[in-house]
Amino acid sequence: MKELLYMELAEVYHRLESTTKRLEKTEILAELLRSVDKELLPDVTILMLGRVFPIWSEEELGVGIKLLMKAISLVVGVSMDEIEDEIREQGDIGLASEKLFSRKTQTTFFSQPLTVEFVYSRLKALASASGDRAQSKKINILVEVLSQAKPLEARYITRTVLEELRVGVAEGIIRDAIARAFEVDPALVERAHMLTNDLGMVAAVAREEGEPGLGRLNLEPGRPVKPMLAQLASSIESAITELGRAFCETKYDGIRVQIHRCGDEISIFTRRLENITAAVPEILEGVEEALPADDYIVEGEIIVTMDGRPASFQYILQRVRRKYDVERLTREVPLSLFLFDVLYHREPLIDEPLRHRREVLESILSEIPGRVEASRMVDVGPDNLNDALWLFEESIREGHEGIMIKDTEAPYIPGIRGKKMLKFKAEPETLDLIVVGGTYGRGKRAHLVGSYLLAARDEDSGDLVTVAHVATGLDDETLQQLSERMEKLAIERKGRKLLVRPEIILEVAYSEIVKSPEYESGYSLRFPVVKRIRDDLCLDDVDTVGRIESLFQSGQPDQPG
């Protein structure tokens, strides 16, 4: 196998970071992918996203900024305070590392140039470090890699460790680069990625097997896919008119899950593709009873009910985030599952119409009342519109969010927010935005972050662009918890203001979207209010500037949605 020096990869990162032009980025990436040996191609493709593992992998590097700073301190020979000062000045750990490494006088004797294979294998080893001395093992691995790094390499190694590459490359650009590099249909690349969630695999197949190979990639139990997403419906009547015939289902306010059975193993994934099987034993037990022992992928919503009504979303988060006291929480906060789709049963079903998929689901599901049930659904057309209106009113009366309105003839399209699936809620539409900064209060509230700077996602570059500040909707207990999290995520401070690593996602309601030069997105939210913390979402779930623009043009949220 031909070696690829990590410096060559770092120089590609630098070229990508130096241009904002999508076509130029695509060509730079295509050139790299063409030149890489087939054995390294999957790894390099994933590294281009600033990740070490596919998004659905359970493996995590488990390295926070403090641990990384300690490794840098050992390699460069400066104090933690000096590193913090440099990060504050540069506003980025990558640039700070590059500057610190450029001052390093001591070099490792007989050190060899870093290769991509070596760096990638050592970064993967971080995820395997466990036990009583896990932190020490991780530091040793980081020191081993960084002690051989040149300044530019240090910039991108440190960013990769924190999964913050900052070169303006999102999945869409990599898909285009794969298509260009190996002269295959971009639509086939997109579909293959949609079905596998693994661009490294897609790149390797495109290179070795071309379009026929891409066409053979398909859904597999055990490998989760991104969920199909819903657009806003301005009214029930307009939605039914547009679709002609639709399944209307109760919209449950819970955590959307994808449940996979492969052989004897059942795995339960959230919409951010996180495996939560161990945290929800009663759901695991329920699906073992309610579904056959065939390979399958089903989709549904987990909710908490108390006194016969849906409980707060935060109760569900409490369940899925806890790794300990699971047995006690199972008794105190019991969960229910409502299934509404099947993507695989003995064979892939996503290209089948929803009507057929629902029939399959109902044929294989043995409902367990109160534990595992099919979602409540009515088949609606222009001739029985009142059935949809009844379901909406009944769902709201019972404490649910509203209804889903789905085209009965639509295939399942992972990761796409299209017009074949609509939602209509009692409350106005909200946005899921990520916190990138904040401002501390004054006086008695000086220890609390009272205002949060929010960002949306640029779908082309993957960059985060600011869109609003929000300071209302959080009680004192939640403010305290968020402030503690912000402290741990802080990367830069200036007076009362701080910038943070983008990890906290907030669901935000607002009265209106307006154009504004104050924020990088070009838009702002009037009277934003935090509805809830969305720890069930990941960066890819953050709403895009394109969606904000679409809502602005449609004048939302004038109607409930």
Curated annotation (Swiss-Prot):
Its EC number is 6.5.1.1. Coiled coil: none annotated. The keyword Magnesium applies. CDD domains: Adenylation_DNA_ligase_Arch_LigB, OBF_DNA_ligase_Arch_LigB. ATP binds at E249, R256, R271, E301, F340, R417, K423. DNA ligase that seals nicks in double-stranded DNA during DNA replication, DNA recombination and DNA repair. It catalyses: ATP + (deoxyribonucleotide)n-3'-hydroxyl + 5'-phospho-(deoxyribonucleotide)m = (deoxyribonucleotide)n+m + AMP + diphosphate. The keyword Ligase applies. This is DNA ligase. It holds the Pfam family DNA_ligase_A_C. GO terms for molecular function: ATP binding; DNA binding; DNA ligase (ATP) activity; metal ion binding. One of its GO terms (biological process) is lagging strand elongation.
